[in-house]
């Protein structure tokens, strides 16, 4: 209903403002996924949250990417297993046609994703 959408939009704005204040205060922000009502991001489409961190919170593209990788792993206590590309860790990575360190929006363009590796195994190869 319309009232629910309005309330969700107001909540979303307040949520973004809160994240922005925390980021500006130096709080580590971890990107996660969950469904939070009408404005929630569908599972598997959370790359849009990287754009929100850049365009609405004020992070650089690499800070946003770190929020979804290294910082998220630290928040989960899994930094020894995932979150960065290091010897002995699970190799979860994407190869994209573009430079997400300059423009994170490339990560939500499914046609730009050339290769997906999960735990060191190729899961998708479009090269």
Q: In which residue ranges do the predicted regions lie?
A:
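C-terminal cap of metal-dependent C-N hydrolases
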Residues: 68-70, 87-127
């Amino acid at each position: 209903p319309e009232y629910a959408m309005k309330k969700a939009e107001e909540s979303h704005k307040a949520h973004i403002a809160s994240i922005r204040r925390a980021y500006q205060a130096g709080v580590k922000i971890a990107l996660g996924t969950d469904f939070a009502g009408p404005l929630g991001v569908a599972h598997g489409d959370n790359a849009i949250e990287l754009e929100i961190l850049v365009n609405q919170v004020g992070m650089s593209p690499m800070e946003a990417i770190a929020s979804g990788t290294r910082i998220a792993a630290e928040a989960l206590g899994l930094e020894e297993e995932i979150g960065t590309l290091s010897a002995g860790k699970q190799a979860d990575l994407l190869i994209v046609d573009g430079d997400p360190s300059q423009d994170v929006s490339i990560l939500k363009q499914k046609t730009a994703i050339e290769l997906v590796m999960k735990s060191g195994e190729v899961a998708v190869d479009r090269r």
